[in-house]
Curated annotation (Swiss-Prot):
Protein name: P2X purinoceptor 4
Organism phylogeny: Eukaryota, Metazoa, Chordata, Craniata, Vertebrata
PANTHER family membership: P2X PURINOCEPTOR, P2X PURINOCEPTOR 4
Transmembrane segments: 34-54, 339-359
Subunit structure: Functional P2RXs are organized as homomeric and heteromeric trimers. Forms heterotrimer with P2RX1. Interacts with P2RX7 (via C-terminus); this interaction is functional only in the presence of ATP. Forms heterotrimer with P2RX4; functional differences between homomeric P2RX4 and P2RX4/6 heterotrimer are minor. Interacts with AP1M2.
Gene that produces this protein: P2RX4
GO molecular function, one term: extracellularly ATP-gated monoatomic cation channel activity
Topology relative to the membrane: Multi-pass membrane protein
Activity regulation remarks: Activated by ATP. pH-dependent and inhibited by acidic pH.
Length: 388
């Protein structure tokens, strides 16, 4: 109990104040200056020069529009001679911050609603009607089973379904890609950015770009780094992939536009930087459900009014435009905050040197005596002197 009272009394009735002691030691002095120099180098070099700690920052607000250009032709036994332009291979016509270019397809023509044999599979091949369950519709079924086992070809029978007939057969994807010439199609990317905190706006079609230049330029990282027109093959190649390979089963490519702007400089120095990467992960060792595809249909009616459709399973490349960046401009508040933080960090040198001097050096007990001085209360000390 007495010990607790002593500790409590010491806490309540004692006061400590810093005492300046000048220690003439080469080791301690050199260490102190070294730590101070390191802190100054960090504050000046990293905080102010590299991280621009004297600036207020803002994130980019962006809008993007994409326009595709290019035309090609095909001549096949199924479709005959055909010209393909933007309205044929850009599906849908407009998307938010992205565009889909169809490069390959499986076409099932002249479908009508009726009864027909299902495509052969583990659950659809049959020998008798007993092998088929009427009314069943599996996840991968083309229609609803009727319960009948019918001839698929001369040697094979499958369960009959009520569906759009003939049903689609997508077991084999065309190789090479149906629209392999899409490698030379181009994308015009128009990007407008805005930093609301600074009321600063700009677009990637720079002021020095003329109409004549825009009609002839194609983006190249070395010769035309600010041309907003990109060749599809070059985009895929820059991401480290082969266009003809990805065109077969499709994929997702990212066009990244980086806007990092120092608004303490002229607006002409605020420029877009382009980079490219494939966004859908492709694992060759586990190549399950690769690529990118979807289905759509074109409907029409014959002279008798019967509804028909052409079903297209479209494989292609979706180009996502990803815009990011930040802008900075001088502001007194972050400047003063970082200066104050830097000055506070200088105190670390004193604390570190105190620890070395008072607890690690051979003469630590001597330095402790010089560092700390115990003084009694003035009135109590005066009373003790009078008694003596």
């Amino acid at each position: 109990m007495t010990g607790c009272c002593t500790v409590l009394g010491a806490f309540l009735f004692e006061y400590d104040t810093p005492r300046i002691v000048l220690i003439r030691s080469r080791k301690v002095g050199l260490m102190n200056r070294t730590v101070q120099l390191l802190i100054l180098a960090y504050v000046i070099g990293w905080v102010f020069v590299w991280e621009k700690g004297y600036q207020e920052t803002d994130s980019v607000v962006s809008s993007v529009t994409v326009k595709a250009k290019g035309v090609t032709m095909t001549n096949t036994s199924k479709l005959g001679f055909r010209i393909w332009d933007v309205a044929d291979y850009v599906i849908p016509a407009q998307e938010e911050n992205s565009v889909f270019i169809m490069t390959n397809m499986v076409i099932t023509m002249n479908q009508t609603q009726g009864l027909c044999p299902e495509i052969p599979g583990k659950t659809t091949v049959c020998e008798t009607d007993a092998n088929c369950t009427a009314g069943s519709a599996g996840t991968h079924s083309s229609g609803v089973a009727t319960g009948r086992c019918v001839s698929f070809n001369g040697t094979l029978k499958t369960c009959e379904v009520a569906a759009w007939c003939p049903v689609e057969d997508d077991t084999e994807v065309p190789k090479p890609a149906f629209l392999k010439a899409a490698e030379n199609f181009t994308l015009l990317v128009k990007n407008n950015i805005w930093y609301p905190k600074f009321n600063f706006s700009k677009r990637n079609i720079l002021p020095n770009i003329t109409t004549a230049y825009l009609k002839t330029c194609i983006y190249d990282a070395k010769t035309d780094p600010f041309c907003p027109i990109f060749r599809l093959g070059k985009i895929v190649e820059s991401a480290g992939h082969s266009f003809q390979d990805i065109a077969i089963e499709g994929g997702i490519m990212g066009i990244q536009i980086k806007w990092n702007c120092n608004l303490d400089r002229a607006a002409s120095f605020c420029l877009p930087r382009y980079s490219f990467r494939r966004l859908d992960t492709r694992d060759l060792a586990h190549n399950v459900s690769p690529g990118y595809n979807f289905r759509f249909a074109k409907y029409y009616s014959d002279l008798k009014g019967a509804e028909h459709r052409t079903l297209i399973k479209a494989y292609g490349i979706r180009f996502d435009i990803i815009v990011f960046g930040k802008a900075g401009k001088f502001d007194i508040i972050p400047t003063m905050i970082n200066i104050g933080s830097g000055l506070a960090l200088l105190g670390v040198a004193t604390v570190l040197c105190d620890v070395i001097v008072l607890y690690c050096m051979k003469k630590r007990y001597y330095y402790r005596e010089k560092k700390y001085k115990y003084v009694e209360d003035y009135e109590q000390g005066l009373g003790n002197q009078m008694e003596q």
